[in-house]
Amino acid sequence: HGPHHIMDILCNYHNWDIQWGNHDILWMGAAAGNDICIANVVRFVTRFGNTGVLEDGYGINLLPLATFAMETYADDPCALFGLRPVPGETISNPKTLRLLAQMHKAISIIQFKLEAETISRRPEFEMDDRMLLHLIDFERGIITINGKEYPMKDCNFPTIDPKDPYKLTDEEKEIVAKLHRSFVGSEKLRKHIKHIFRNGCMYTITNSNLLFHASIPLNADGSLKEIEIRGKKYKGKALLEKVGHLIRTAYFAEGDSEEKRFAMDYVWYLWCGKDSPAFDKAKMATFERYFLDDKELHKETKGHYYTLRDKEEVCDMILDEFGVVGKHRHIINGHVPVKTLKGENPIKANGKLMVIDGGFSKAYHLETGIAGYTLEYHSRGFQLVQHEPFTSMQKAIEEGQDIKSTTQIVELSSQRVMVKDTDKGRELIAQINDLKKLLEAYRIGLIKERSNKY
């Protein structure tokens, strides 16, 4: 149970490739030492009851956070921070459930404070709307957003000073420092993250297929949106390449240069920033979803890419931008789970786009109705395999169950693709031609045979 087991297998696998998504980048940022990324990762494991991933999988010590949370919220039921239900997984021990809720609340408040520090330091991120603690009237239990008052579902914040709401307490600073040391010092996490760097990037092109995780930021008219990074504008392919460079700088750059510091901050921006190609939504409404009932405030308006990608001409424009050629060329996407329960189709733009995020995570099974997709590519074309939820290996053995899958033919060609038609085939042909030229040069005497004298 947990991603560390999968990463152990991948680290020993001879050939694999990954296009980084927002969750990958969050973990990469945490491993690099970005404290907001660390807080987010810890928040997720407490939210879903997966603390074993950090403690057992990566040797990260959560005891200081647990001790602090128990003391700080001893009289607080932390009702808003209960475990998010996951199909097939339950924690029945009430003491464990209470401790997880306390830890969840404690790290969430720390996260909001840390975010404010970066937002203030980087006005170019334009994320002032994510600083909300100073808008709370703690005595009345309300918050004022855009001139309108909303009741808070919880207003018990013993670590927040209303006069200086974003200041970390001394205990919180100590917890942040200890978590930082644990993440940066985890040998196993370092090994796994380095493999993700070695075998991954923001996008890849293979056999006339363009693969990227989430989005290519677009304007309302379908043109590529220019994103300014440190005074220079980037769009399309150049944007993804710049972003990839910044992620590597954040992790690998030595010293404490301004370039390194900016890259570290930008890695967090990629997780939740409005112009991030790994996110591309107006906001990440974490605070609102926890503390406010008004569903309008929960909305995370998607960027134009998510609506315009259904148009074939938009997909063609993006494929042209990345230099993808071929009669059968496609964009292969993930990020947004395909809600098959609502009749959503993973094949879009007349077959030009395939969205293969069906929600492998159990937390999404109830939302999507399935347990993910696998896209298979072979000499005849594409087929999409839709998986049904898998309960457990033990149940599969006892009841003779297996992973149930449904196969859908996406694209079938009457003429089989030969090895020579693939990227690898073209590479082999180029090598063969080079060898032929070398042989010809030897035959006509341009290359002399050397005699070895001993």
Functional labels for PLM-detected ranges:
Residues 1-454:
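Feature recognizes metal-dependent phosphohydrolase scaffolds
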